[in-house]
């Protein structure tokens, strides 16, 4: 919407992919995937589809450009900006941003660096959920965490590129006194002939020859 002229322009239609959450099943309008930020000159906005970033001309006169060059859709990974104390909504041409790449097939997550030319650089990746807490004022160091079923979300300290990581807390030492568990990704075909995915949690001493009670959660 142009406040000066009152003109409304659809700036995302030419992208060719839905900009809303297609799988949304609530009795309400589906939410948009959202906005990643803006260019410093104020002429473009970065929008998300299910996988990638799009650089979109606010006037609608120029064709949208896929900043991430379709990498997310090609590899089945959702690329999103990660939060931290240095997060910006406005990006200069020479800036980089830390993004997460969540693999929709394996459920693994990666932390990458994305520049404004669309180049991605992998910093770390694995069967974890990652969170960034703070970068140092000089942007040389970072505090972050990772977690999964077997690893508690302790704090880690590293260089800003996440190299040479050192765990600095041990918040859940009592975990070592208990039998814990494992998890694996399972897939099946539902009654609509569509593939579903789920996480199967097993006890630490699981014996496939025995029967166990099962709890199932659908969401």
How should each PLM-predicted stretch be described?
Residues 1-32, 46-54, 73, 101-110, ...:
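A flexible loop/linker signature enriched in serine peptidases of the S9 family
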Residues 1-3, 37-38, 44-52, 57-58, ...:
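Beta-strand C-termini and the immediately following turn/loop, strongest in propeller blades
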Residues 2, 6-9, 62-69, 111-123, ...:
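Surface-exposed loop/turn elements that mediate protein-protein interactions on large endomembrane-trafficking
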Residues 6-30, 67-89, 170-184:
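Surface-exposed loop and turn segments in beta-propeller and other repeat-based domains
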Residues 8, 35, 43-45, 52-54, ...:
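Beta-sheet entry/capping signal
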Residues 29-30, 38, 126, 178-181, ...:
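Short solvent-exposed loop/turn micro-motifs enriched in small/polar/acidic residues
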Residues 113-116, 122-136, 142:
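Extended, charged coiled-coil "arm/hinge" scaffolds of SMC/Rad50-like chromosome-maintenance ATPases
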Residues 131-219:
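Serine-hydrolase catalytic core recognition
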């Amino acid at each position: 919407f142009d406040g000066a002229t009152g003109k409304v322009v659809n700036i995302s239609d030419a992208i060719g992919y839905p900009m809303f959450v297609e799988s949304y099943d609530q009795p309400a309008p589906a939410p948009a995937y959202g906005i990643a930020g803006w260019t410093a000159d104020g002429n473009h906005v970065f929008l998300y589809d299910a996988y990638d970033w799009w650089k979109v001309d606010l006037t609608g006169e120029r064709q949208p450009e896929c900043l991430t060059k379709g990498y997310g859709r090609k590899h089945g990974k959702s690329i999103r900006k990660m939060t931290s104390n240095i997060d910006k909504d406005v990006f200069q041409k020479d800036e980089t941003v830390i993004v997460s790449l969540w693999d929709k097939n394996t459920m693994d997550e990666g932390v990458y660096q994305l520049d404004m030319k669309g180049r991605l650089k992998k910093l770390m990746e694995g069967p974890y959920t990652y969170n960034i807490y703070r970068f140092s004022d000089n942007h040389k160091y970072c505090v972050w965490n990772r977690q999964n079923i077997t690893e508690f979300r302790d704090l880690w300290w590293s260089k800003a590129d996440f190299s040479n990581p050192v765990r600095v807390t041990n918040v859940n030492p009592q975990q070592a006194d208990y039998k814990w568990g494992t998890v694996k990704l399972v897939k099946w075909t539902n009654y609509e002939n569509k593939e579903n995915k789920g996480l199967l949690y097993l006890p630490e001493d699981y014996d496939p020859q025995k029967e166990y009670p099962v709890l199932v959660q659908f969401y």
